[in-house]
Amino acid sequence: MLHMSGEMTKAMENHASGCCINIGTLESIAVSILPEILTGYSDKHPKVSVQIENGPTFGPNGLVERVLGHSCDLAFISGDVEHPDIRKWVIGEDHVVIVTNKDCGETVDFKKLLQNQILSFPTGCVCRILYDRFAEHIGVKSKQVLESSSLSTIFSNVVAGMGVACFPKSCISFYKTRFPVYS
Protein backbone atom coordinates (compact mmCIF):
# COMPACT_ATOMS: atom_id res chain seq x y z
CA MET A 1 0.00 0.00 0.00
CA LEU A 2 1.26 3.45 -0.82
CA HIS A 3 0.76 6.20 1.72
CA MET A 4 1.50 9.83 1.04
CA SER A 5 1.12 13.18 2.73
CA GLY A 6 -1.05 15.75 0.96
CA GLU A 7 1.90 18.06 0.21
CA MET A 8 3.83 15.26 -1.44
CA THR A 9 0.88 14.30 -3.60
CA LYS A 10 0.88 17.82 -5.08
CA ALA A 11 4.65 17.77 -5.57
CA MET A 12 4.52 14.45 -7.40
CA GLU A 13 1.67 15.62 -9.57
CA ASN A 14 3.65 18.73 -10.53
CA HIS A 15 6.89 16.77 -11.12
CA ALA A 16 9.02 19.81 -10.34
CA SER A 17 12.48 19.64 -11.86
CA GLY A 18 15.19 19.19 -9.29
CA CYS A 19 12.68 17.82 -6.77
CA CYS A 20 13.79 15.14 -4.33
CA ILE A 21 11.36 12.50 -3.12
CA ASN A 22 12.14 10.68 0.12
CA ILE A 23 10.51 7.23 -0.02
CA GLY A 24 10.02 5.00 2.99
CA THR A 25 9.56 1.32 2.29
CA LEU A 26 9.55 -2.10 3.82
CA GLU A 27 12.65 -4.00 2.79
CA SER A 28 10.45 -6.80 1.43
CA ILE A 29 8.83 -4.28 -0.94
CA ALA A 30 12.22 -2.72 -1.75
CA VAL A 31 13.46 -6.05 -3.13
CA SER A 32 10.26 -7.13 -4.88
CA ILE A 33 8.07 -4.49 -6.55
CA LEU A 34 9.80 -1.18 -5.83
CA PRO A 35 12.54 -1.50 -8.50
CA GLU A 36 9.96 -1.79 -11.28
CA ILE A 37 7.92 1.12 -9.90
CA LEU A 38 10.99 3.34 -9.58
CA THR A 39 12.25 2.45 -13.05
CA GLY A 40 8.95 3.50 -14.60
CA TYR A 41 8.83 6.70 -12.55
CA SER A 42 12.47 7.61 -13.27
CA ASP A 43 11.96 7.08 -17.00
CA LYS A 44 9.06 9.56 -16.98
CA HIS A 45 10.66 12.03 -14.55
CA PRO A 46 14.46 11.87 -14.89
CA LYS A 47 15.03 15.18 -13.07
CA VAL A 48 13.43 13.95 -9.85
CA SER A 49 15.91 12.57 -7.33
CA VAL A 50 14.81 9.63 -5.17
CA GLN A 51 16.05 8.65 -1.71
CA ILE A 52 14.96 5.37 -0.08
CA GLU A 53 14.70 4.55 3.63
CA ASN A 54 13.75 1.10 4.94
CA GLY A 55 11.75 0.52 8.10
CA PRO A 56 8.74 -1.24 9.64
CA THR A 57 5.18 -0.11 8.95
CA PHE A 58 4.30 0.68 12.56
CA GLY A 59 6.10 1.74 15.72
CA PRO A 60 7.76 4.89 17.03
CA ASN A 61 10.09 5.16 14.03
CA GLY A 62 7.80 3.29 11.64
CA LEU A 63 6.99 4.42 8.13
CA VAL A 64 3.51 5.68 9.05
CA GLU A 65 5.03 7.93 11.74
CA ARG A 66 7.71 9.11 9.30
CA VAL A 67 5.08 10.14 6.74
CA LEU A 68 3.05 11.94 9.41
CA GLY A 69 6.21 13.64 10.70
CA HIS A 70 7.21 14.62 7.14
CA SER A 71 10.58 12.85 7.28
CA CYS A 72 9.29 10.62 4.44
CA ASP A 73 7.27 12.01 1.57
CA LEU A 74 5.58 8.70 0.86
CA ALA A 75 5.80 5.11 2.04
CA PHE A 76 5.19 1.65 0.66
CA ILE A 77 3.79 -0.38 3.55
CA SER A 78 1.78 -3.48 4.41
CA GLY A 79 -1.45 -3.35 6.33
CA ASP A 80 -4.13 -0.74 6.64
CA VAL A 81 -3.89 2.74 8.10
CA GLU A 82 -6.74 5.16 8.66
CA HIS A 83 -5.63 8.73 9.33
CA PRO A 84 -7.11 12.02 8.07
CA ASP A 85 -3.67 13.37 7.08
CA ILE A 86 -2.76 10.38 4.92
CA ARG A 87 -3.91 9.53 1.42
CA LYS A 88 -3.54 5.91 0.41
CA TRP A 89 -3.70 3.72 -2.64
CA VAL A 90 -3.64 -0.05 -2.79
CA ILE A 91 -1.04 -0.92 -5.40
CA GLY A 92 -1.12 -4.68 -4.98
CA GLU A 93 -1.93 -7.61 -2.78
CA ASP A 94 0.33 -10.44 -1.70
CA HIS A 95 0.20 -13.68 0.27
CA VAL A 96 2.10 -14.08 3.51
CA VAL A 97 4.11 -17.31 3.68
CA ILE A 98 6.27 -19.09 6.24
CA VAL A 99 9.78 -20.03 5.14
CA THR A 100 12.10 -22.59 6.70
CA ASN A 101 15.22 -24.47 5.69
CA LYS A 102 15.16 -27.57 3.47
CA ASP A 103 15.55 -29.94 6.43
CA CYS A 104 11.90 -29.35 7.32
CA GLY A 105 10.70 -31.79 4.65
CA GLU A 106 7.66 -31.82 2.40
CA THR A 107 4.88 -32.34 4.98
CA VAL A 108 4.43 -29.60 7.52
CA ASP A 109 3.02 -29.72 11.03
CA PHE A 110 2.41 -26.01 11.68
CA LYS A 111 2.19 -26.50 15.45
CA LYS A 112 5.65 -28.06 15.43
CA LEU A 113 7.04 -25.62 12.85
CA LEU A 114 5.92 -22.53 14.76
CA GLN A 115 7.66 -23.72 17.91
CA ASN A 116 10.94 -22.76 16.23
CA GLN A 117 12.56 -19.40 16.84
CA ILE A 118 11.12 -16.71 14.55
CA LEU A 119 13.52 -14.63 12.49
CA SER A 120 11.91 -11.27 11.87
CA PHE A 121 12.21 -7.60 11.27
CA PRO A 122 11.91 -5.47 14.43
CA THR A 123 8.61 -4.80 16.19
CA GLY A 124 6.16 -3.06 13.86
CA CYS A 125 6.57 -5.56 11.01
CA VAL A 126 3.11 -6.56 9.73
CA CYS A 127 4.26 -10.08 8.81
CA ARG A 128 5.51 -10.59 12.35
CA ILE A 129 2.15 -9.41 13.71
CA LEU A 130 0.35 -11.87 11.40
CA TYR A 131 2.75 -14.68 12.38
CA ASP A 132 2.07 -14.06 16.08
CA ARG A 133 -1.70 -14.03 15.47
CA PHE A 134 -1.52 -17.29 13.51
CA ALA A 135 0.62 -18.96 16.20
CA GLU A 136 -1.85 -17.86 18.87
CA HIS A 137 -4.78 -19.05 16.73
CA ILE A 138 -3.38 -22.59 16.50
CA GLY A 139 -2.38 -22.60 20.16
CA VAL A 140 1.38 -22.15 19.88
CA LYS A 141 3.27 -19.83 22.18
CA SER A 142 5.85 -17.93 20.11
CA LYS A 143 9.43 -18.68 21.00
CA GLN A 144 12.42 -16.41 21.05
CA VAL A 145 12.70 -13.81 18.29
CA LEU A 146 15.91 -13.10 16.41
CA GLU A 147 15.46 -9.60 15.00
CA SER A 148 17.32 -8.08 12.08
CA SER A 149 16.64 -5.12 9.83
CA SER A 150 18.20 -6.99 6.88
CA LEU A 151 16.20 -9.35 4.69
CA SER A 152 19.39 -11.11 3.55
CA THR A 153 20.45 -11.69 7.16
CA ILE A 154 17.07 -13.17 8.03
CA PHE A 155 17.01 -15.45 4.98
CA SER A 156 20.62 -16.57 5.51
CA ASN A 157 19.79 -17.55 9.09
CA VAL A 158 16.68 -19.45 7.93
CA VAL A 159 18.84 -21.40 5.46
CA ALA A 160 21.31 -22.12 8.29
CA GLY A 161 18.49 -23.62 10.37
CA MET A 162 18.25 -20.89 13.02
CA GLY A 163 14.45 -20.73 12.78
CA VAL A 164 11.52 -19.77 10.55
CA ALA A 165 10.42 -16.49 9.01
CA CYS A 166 7.17 -15.02 7.70
CA PHE A 167 7.22 -12.78 4.60
CA PRO A 168 5.20 -11.67 1.59
CA LYS A 169 5.53 -14.32 -1.10
CA SER A 170 6.70 -11.79 -3.70
CA CYS A 171 9.86 -10.90 -1.79
CA ILE A 172 11.21 -14.43 -1.66
CA SER A 173 11.24 -15.38 -5.35
CA PHE A 174 15.02 -14.88 -5.52
CA TYR A 175 15.53 -17.23 -2.58
CA LYS A 176 12.84 -19.78 -3.46
CA THR A 177 15.24 -22.49 -4.60
CA ARG A 178 17.15 -22.36 -1.29
CA PHE A 179 14.32 -23.37 1.07
CA PRO A 180 10.67 -24.49 1.12
CA VAL A 181 7.86 -21.96 1.20
CA TYR A 182 4.53 -22.76 2.90
CA SER A 183 1.36 -20.81 2.25
Regions found by a protein language model. Name each.
Residues 1-14:
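Alpha-helical "hinge/linker" immediately C-terminal to small N-terminal DNA-binding modules
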Residues 18-83:
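Central regulatory/effector-binding core of bacterial HTH transcription factors
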Residues 22-25, 75, 99, 119, ...:
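Short, well-ordered beta-strand segments
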Residues 64-68, 113, 156-162:
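Hydrophobic residues within well-ordered alpha-helices
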Residues 72-78, 147-149, 166-168, 172:
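Short beta-strand and adjacent tight-turn residues that come in two discontinuous sequence segments
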Residues 83-94, 153-183:
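Beta-alpha-beta core module
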Residues 83-123:
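Flexible hinge/capping segments at coil-to-helix
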Residues 117-138:
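Secondary-structure junction motif
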